[in-house]
């Protein structure tokens, strides 16, 4: 009966020590132990070693074939589909480029329009502020002229108002003017 050796085997020992009769303690097998084995056991060990090496080579060869075939299949598929896909990508890029240019132009036009509107509103605002200042100056001038005219006004004297009343009215108008400004 062939049993697997339960202990660890070093690299210096024969790699087939895993399949030997378990007659010795683990790790105690050396090359001399194999010299006394019968030819049948030697042949069986040789076959096990070759089988193990063959299995290892086949699995690594299978992995390399599997790994190498996949990209090869994909590259064949890619090369067949590449012109169509490249054309699709090129058209998509071209459409994207046109859309991006259109978007930039719209944005530029909108910015220019807003800039013009802003400048126009600033101009109108400046004109209105100038007009307000002009109207304030005109008001002050008219109040001054009115106050110069009041003491000599015949119409007011006929109404029964005295110069004192006129002076109080003038002070009241000045106060209202400063409150409104």
From Swiss-Prot:
Domain bZIP: 86-149
Region Basic motif, residue ranges: 88-110
Domain of life according to the entry: Eukaryota
Record's subcellular location: Nucleus
GO biological process terms, semicolon-separated: cellular response to amino acid starvation; endoplasmic reticulum unfolded protein response; gluconeogenesis; negative regulation of DNA-templated transcription; negative regulation of ERK1 and ERK2 cascade; negative regulation of transcription by RNA polymerase II; positive regulation of cell population proliferation; positive regulation of gene expression
InterPro entries: AP-1, bZIP, bZIP_sf
Entry GO MF terms: DNA binding; DNA-binding transcription activator activity, RNA polymerase II-specific; DNA-binding transcription repressor activity, RNA polymerase II-specific; protein heterodimerization activity; protein homodimerization activity; RNA polymerase II cis-regulatory region sequence-specific DNA binding
Stretch list, region Disordered: 73-97
Phosphothreonine PTM positions: 162
A cellular component annotation (GO) from this entry: nucleus
PROSITE patterns the UniProt entry points to: BZIP, BZIP_BASIC
Cross-link (Glycyl lysine isopeptide (Lys-Gly) (interchain with G-Cter in SUMO2)): 78, 175
Alphabetized UniProt keyword annotations: DNA-binding, Isopeptide bond, Nucleus, Phosphoprotein, Repressor, Transcription, Transcription regulation, Ubl conjugation
Region (Leucine-zipper) location: 114-142
Expression induction or repression: By stress.
Subunit structure as annotated in this protein's UniProt entry: Binds DNA as a homodimer or a heterodimer. Interacts with KAT5; promoting KAT5 autoacetylation and KAT5 deubiquitination by USP7.
Protein family according to the UniProt entry: Belongs to the bZIP family. ATF subfamily.
Function summary: This protein binds the cAMP response element (CRE) (consensus: 5'-GTGACGT[AC][AG]-3'), a sequence present in many viral and cellular promoters. Represses transcription from promoters with ATF sites. It may repress transcription by stabilizing the binding of inhibitory cofactors at the promoter.
PANTHER family: CYCLIC AMP-DEPENDENT TRANSCRIPTION FACTOR ATF-3, FOS TRANSCRIPTION FACTOR-RELATED
Annotated protein name in UniProt: Cyclic AMP-dependent transcription factor ATF-3
């Amino acid at each position: 009966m062939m049993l697997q050796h339960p202990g660890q085997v070093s690299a210096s020992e024969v790699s087939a020590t895993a399949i030997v009769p378990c007659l010795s303690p683990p790790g105690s097998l050396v090359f001399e132990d194999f010299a006394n084995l019968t030819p049948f056991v030697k042949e069986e060990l040789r076959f096990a070693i070759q089988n193990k090496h063959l299995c290892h080579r086949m699995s690594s060869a299978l992995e390399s074939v599997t790994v190498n075939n996949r990209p090869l299949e994909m590259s064949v598929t890619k090369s067949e589909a590449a012109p169509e896909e490249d054309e699709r990508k090129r058209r998509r890029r071209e459409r994207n480029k046109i859309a991006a240019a259109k978007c930039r132009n719209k944005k530029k036009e909108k910015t220019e329009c807003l800039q013009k509107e802003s400048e126009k509103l600033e101009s109108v605002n400046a004109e209105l502020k100038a007009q307000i200042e002009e109207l304030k100056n005109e008001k002050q001038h008219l109040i001054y002229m009115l106050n110069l005219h009041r003491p000599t006004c015949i119409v007011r004297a006929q109404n029964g108002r005295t110069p004192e009343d006129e002076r109080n009215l003038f002070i009241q108008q000045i106060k209202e003017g400063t409150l409104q400004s």
